[in-house]
Amino acid sequence: TFVKYIEEGKGGWIGFHHATLLGEFDGFPLWQWFSDFMGGVRFQNYIAPLADGTVLVEDKKHPVMKGVQASFVVPDDEWYTYDKSPRPNVRVLASVDEATYTPASDIKMGDHPVVWVNESKKARNVYFQIGHSKRLYETEDFTKMFRNAINWTLGK
């Protein structure tokens, strides 16, 4: 039912953080369709303890990014890394500058998108890799993106 909803554009979808914890966990196989929907990524690692990081807006013209600063700090987040960048398969709206992690971390993936949409699906969709810490929901730029995402996925 979810696949049909997304493939046929029956509505919109907003995903957060844990949605890309993709792999074989607790005896469950990877859901290949959803991995493809998320840009073909497979969860690799994450940065612990939580770290601040600077997010760089790459696509200022997308409605989800309307009114969002060109860069902003995301506090205390758990930054996932993947086996590869989803960039070839999705439209990247923002990425994290891994050199800004505080505290610093050796866990990096290079090209590190953190907000994207998959335009190969009819449903309007947006995924936010950020979202582990409640502090994110207190930041102006994220709450603006989130409101924009709600309106955009609803077609408003």
Where are these regions (language model features)?
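Sequence-level detector for tyrosine residue identity
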Residues: Y5, W33, Y46, Y80-Y82, ...
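Extracellular ligand-binding/catalytic regions of CAZymes and related secreted enzymes
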Residues: A99-K156
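Catalytic beta-strand/loop cores that center a nucleophilic Ser/Cys/Thr
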Residues: G40-K122
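A glycine-rich, often tryptophan-bearing local segment used as a flexible ligand/cofactor-contacting loop or short
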Residues: T1-G67
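Solvent-exposed loop/turn segments at secondary-structure junctions
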Residues: W13, A19-G23, A70-F72, E98-T100, ...
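Loop/turn elements at helix/coil->beta-strand transitions in domains of secreted/extracellular proteins
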Residues: E8-W13, R87-R91, K122-R124, K156
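Oxidoreductase and adenylate-handling cofactor-binding alpha/beta cores
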Residues: L30-G39, V74-D76, Y82-V90, G131, ...
